[in-house]
């Protein structure tokens, strides 16, 4: 199902995301010994900030997600590390296809949107499909542009009842007025 960017824009710019950037700057500070290999097995992940409460955004119902997702966040001098554990019973078919870079990912995926400056003027969107397809873009009030190609890293892996996506977004990926 195609992503509804209008819904995302409305949600993204409903309020400034200064809290999100502040979170990244104050989150689990670690020395980067994380290998982006699609497996969250490094000791740093055990001490990462953990988020587990998510709602359905496609379709945009706001209801509690049907299957649990765990997101771990670590901030280092090199950037932000994000690890997703996406639980999905083996009995439920996964959409696990590879798509070209920046093509619409019509598969199971994780999306991270960050307003690095906390101004609600520009957000950076990073999407990883379950087969490690990547899509990124810039979100501004009323617009989404996939013309931007940031340098960031991801890898995914899959088990019977869950799949991982592991992401590293370097601080240098976007201009910031207050870089860490």
Question: What is each PLM-predicted segment?
Answer:
Residues 14-27:
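Bacterial N-terminal signal peptides
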